[in-house]
Amino acid sequence: MPRSLKKGPFIDLHLLKKVEKAVESGDKKPIKTWSRRSMIIPTMIGLTIAVHNGRQHVPVFVTDEMIGHKLGEFAPTRTYRGHAADKKAKKK
């Protein structure tokens, strides 16, 4: 079930302060955050946000198509290495 429209988008206060500071100063340095649950808002467009995936910070460049999505959607937490090859099929 999606979030109610009357509540508005959720964004952590500390991240919002960092974004506003970067926008007013024109700083292009990546903003480090652990807040994967924060929603992308229009003021973030053009900024690079380094989102933590549990091991490292993944740089995410925010575009206008990303508005309304959560930051965690763009920093995958699991790595898929593929299934093991079938040894019987390899010999034939």
From Swiss-Prot:
| Presence of keyword Ribonucleoprotein | yes
* Example GO biological process: translation
Please state the span of the N-terminal signal peptide per the UniProt entry: none
| Classification via Pfam families | Ribosomal_S19
* Record keywords, A-Z: Ribonucleoprotein, Ribosomal protein, RNA-binding, rRNA-binding
This protein's superkingdom?
Answer: Bacteria
Coiled-coil-forming residues are none
Would you tell me the Gene Ontology cellular component terms? cytoplasm; small ribosomal subunit
Record GO terms (molecular function): rRNA binding; structural constituent of ribosome
Q: Give the family per the record.
A: Belongs to the universal ribosomal protein uS19 family.
| Stated role | Protein S19 forms a complex with S13 that binds strongly to the 16S ribosomal RNA.
Name under which the protein is recorded:
Small ribosomal subunit protein uS19
Q: Which organism is it from?
A: Vibrio cholerae serotype O1 (strain ATCC 39315 / El Tor Inaba N16961)
What is this organism's lineage?
Bacteria, Pseudomonadati, Pseudomonadota, Gammaproteobacteria, Vibrionales
State the encoding gene. Answer: rpsS
